[in-house]
Amino acid sequence: MNTYNLKKMFAVSVASIMCVSALAFSGCGDKKAEVSQTPDETTPATTAVSTADEPTAQNYLESIGIDTATLGINPNIIHDSNPVGFQLDMPKNGDTIAVVHTSYGDITMRLFPEQAPKTVTNFVNLAKAGKYNNSLFSKVTKDFMINGGYCGTSSYGEAFEDEFCDRLFNIRGAVAMSNTGADTNESAFFINQKTAETYKNEGGWEHLANQWDSIKTQLANYKDSNLLTAFIEKNGTNCYDTDSVPDSVKKLYEENGGNAYLDGAYNAVDRGYTVFAQV
């Protein structure tokens, strides 16, 4: 099925997409999305600690003499104690899930309120308020992503900041916020769809590493130029520092596919897309 037909099919099939009611891991008959949470009886909640002063990908800029503060680059990465890949675990007692009902079946998402608290709160509040009702999956790109949730501003009444966690990744099935730049999250989100096979065929980690080598050269060339800010604005998402990514993360993408360069926790210029759920 080509991309055009798939896009058209989704636009029709999810005309009634989501709202929220509190249930325990089960659906109801309505065409809506539910967010539910069961009492945590066995597993304590994970505490995610934001530690902006720890070494991150942004240190590369400082190593070549770029003052990140003057560029407004102030990363606040959430460092989590869960193992790499935990987002693929099945929901347990105490976890929060959302069920999106469509005429082509349900989409169940496990939400991550500890790792992306403000983003999950925004999603739940919008859904409870019925803001996602009758919204569309407006764009479907085969082996890339499904875009949806365009229903206006955030539940906070304005765009809000990114929440990059070093244990949540844009692997296949990950749900992340759409944005138009740093800290511009509102209501829209996307579901990553790139398969492991496509990821490999596109060059995998070698392709990403070569891209980063090229970006490093350009950053060094622009570092003393008044064009540096413009370069970062245009190429920010591509400033994915593969030198700082652990082998366990590389393996995760090799096995599951996804769009690694969208991860903000390993981006040298604090750009990326907040992951807040997993299908």
Q: Model-derived features: where do they sit?
A:
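Core hydrophobic alpha-helical transmembrane segments of single-pass membrane proteins
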Residues: S16-V20
